[in-house]
Amino acid sequence: DLVEIECQRWKGKGVNIKYEVRGNRKGYKAGALKEGLKHDYVQECEYIAMFDADFQPESDFLMRTVPFLVHNPEIALVQTRWKFVNSDECLLTRFQEMSLDYHFKFEQEAGSVVYSFFGFNGTAGVWRISAIDDAGGWKDRTTVEDMDLAVRTALQGWKFVYVGDVKVRSELPSTFKAYRFQQHRWSCGPANLFKKMLMEILENKKVSFWNKIHLLYDFFFVGKIAAHTVTFMYYCFAIPLSVFFPEIQIPLWGVVYVPSVITLCKALGSPSSFHLVILWVLFENVMSLHRIKAAVTGLLDAGRVNEWVVTEKLGDASKIKPTIDVLDAVKVIDVELTTPLVPKLKKRRTRFWEKYNCSEIFVGTCIIISGCYDMLYAKKGYYIYLFIQGIAFLVVGFEYIGTRPP
């Protein structure tokens, strides 16, 4: 309602602005965007700027982005960078900032410079409407409608530009439950899209062979599937397993040097959080298990593949401590004491596997056991890492991270 009031205020000043809502959730975000482009006034526009509800663009946003589209008719999308207003709220938000800073500073920048292609982030970007139409419009076949449109647009020969010096303020999910749902969608959706678009990409005649290789191998296979799988299988399976089997020998460069170099490169995206890099790596190793399960769900097109849970953003509510008026408290106590016959609603007991993340707890326990075996018998010297990594799995498994731990 605040948005509607604000729109009415600007309309009263003579600004051509409209407030539109729809009465259903068909197609989720893709359905809303598709329906939004059907309005008559959209036909008078060449470009569309997109922002999620928690994004706060600066007043000069359009002045700094639209000229790229005006002066280069080959460009379909101008993507800007996200800036986070609550990155210091808790350790979970700091980890997210580190991951997303790396994504924008390196992945998006490299894709823009080398291939003129990258995945649209779903918000904080400006699209050329004719490019959207050329690609077939918004589709709700997956939960990553933004990536779906970006890939189809690239296959039509359009180019993308990433403008890293334009930053739009936004909010990070501060509860682990919300973050977990978000990561499921961000991992399951791309894998599902990869499966559905594989032949379409291979049969396309408008893009070069090397661009197809970039799309299929670099963007989809390595970036969305293999990266999570290799991380988990190496750090959380191969190293613990080598403790029990002396035949499995992992060279020192594979255990220390290469992982250290990769970690340091990723940490360059957030210099202010460099001191958290070890904890961040441990957390990313834990999350790789969740992302693998989501990616497999997407590849198999099963289970929660089309599940869409809106990411919870608390805003200022996370900073407000719940209070109760003294008189209200007395009234509640009085009711409890004077009306003993009033039936109480029984709260359903939450089962252990519903409240906690059992797969993370199981893996963490196994890693700690391997650490104990290494310390007592194998003597390979991995036990310090194994203990720390195992504890990280247990912390996430019992959800003692974020602003609302159990």
Residue ranges and their predicted role:
Residues V3, R22-G23, K29-A30, K34-D40, ...:
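Cytosol-/stroma-facing membrane-proximal "stalk/adaptor" domains immediately downstream
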Residues C7-Y47, S59-T143, D148, A154-L155, ...:
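Long helical/loop segments within the catalytic core of UDP-sugar-dependent glycosyltransferases
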Residues E20-R22, V163-D165, T311:
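Conserved beta-strand termini and adjacent loop/short-helix elements that scaffold enzyme active sites
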Residues R81, G157, V161-R169:
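Catalytic beta-strand/loop signature of glycosyltransferases that borders the donor
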Residues G164-A178, N306:
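Active-site donor/metal-binding and catalytic loop motifs
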Residues N204-V230, G315-L376:
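Loop-to-transmembrane boundary segments
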Residues F221-L314, E360-P406:
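Membrane-embedded multi-pass helical conduit in multi-pass membrane proteins
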